A protein has these predicted regions:
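Glycine-enriched, solvent-exposed interface loops adjoining structured elements
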Residues: 1-211
Length: 211
């Protein structure tokens, strides 16, 4: 949906298509907040439309900060690291598994580099890796009142979820807690279904290859 369509659909949900109660500005604000809510609550696997890449980032001793790389990934969403030095995808490792990297069979090598994120810094092993491409999740672009004709950046399957959260916000502003809670529960239930499904389908192991 475009922002215009989302605004119109939200007006129908709120029983206010003429915008006599909820202004375009209030609905646009609610949509913007809701897009971020969806991005923050869903697994990265559903957010490929928000993926960006920055090429040829130089590392110092295998480390570079988000700010140094010129990126602002939403909730630390690094989805892949490509080792340009050795032409290999890094295996992404969660911080809870870092202790296991002390095992020589699991530590990063030039043929099997590993990467992890800690305190807004990207760490790559072996530290001889000098150049990487970083794939990350960016924030959705806010709509601006009076210029909402662009397509929503999120996957089309998530647009109704955005509207559920936006509807909940606006009913709450209108002092209708029951209707707000109903819309919010609909959104949370769908988030749970989607995340539970992804947990079943995603690869297992101490790390997964980027991309």
């Amino acid at each position: 949906m475009t922002g215009t369509e989302m605004n119109s659909n939200l007006g129908l949900r709120l029983e206010d298509p003429a915008q006599s109660v909820f202004t375009e500005a209030s609905k646009v604000d609610a949509i913007n907040i809701s897009m971020r809510t969806v991005v923050n609550m869903l697994d990265n696997g559903y957010l490929t439309e928000m993926e960006r890449v920055v090429d040829d980032v130089a590392l110092t001793d295998g480390v570079e900060s988000f700010s140094g790389a010129g990126i602002t990934p939403i909730r630390g969403g690094i989805t892949g690291i490509y080792d340009e030095t050795n032409d290999k995808w890094c295996t992404m490792v969660e911080t809870k598994d870092l202790k296991r990297l002390e095992n020589s069979y699991l530590s990063g090598t030039t043929s099997n580099p590993v990467a992890y994120v800690f305190r807004e810094k990207i760490h790559v092993k072996p530290t001889s890796v000098a150049l990487v491409d970083i794939w990350y999740l960016t924030e959705p672009t806010d709509y601006v009142v009076g210029a909402i004709s662009a397509e929503c950046e999120l996957n089309p399957a998530l647009h109704e979820l955005v509207l559920d959260f936006a509807e909940a916000q606006l009913w709450r502003m209108d002092a209708k807690p029951d209707r707000a809670q109903s819309a919010y529960n609909n959104a949370l239930n769908l988030v749970k279904v989607l995340n539970d499904r992804y947990q079943v389908e995603k690869p297992e192991g101490i790390g997964t290859k980027g991309r």
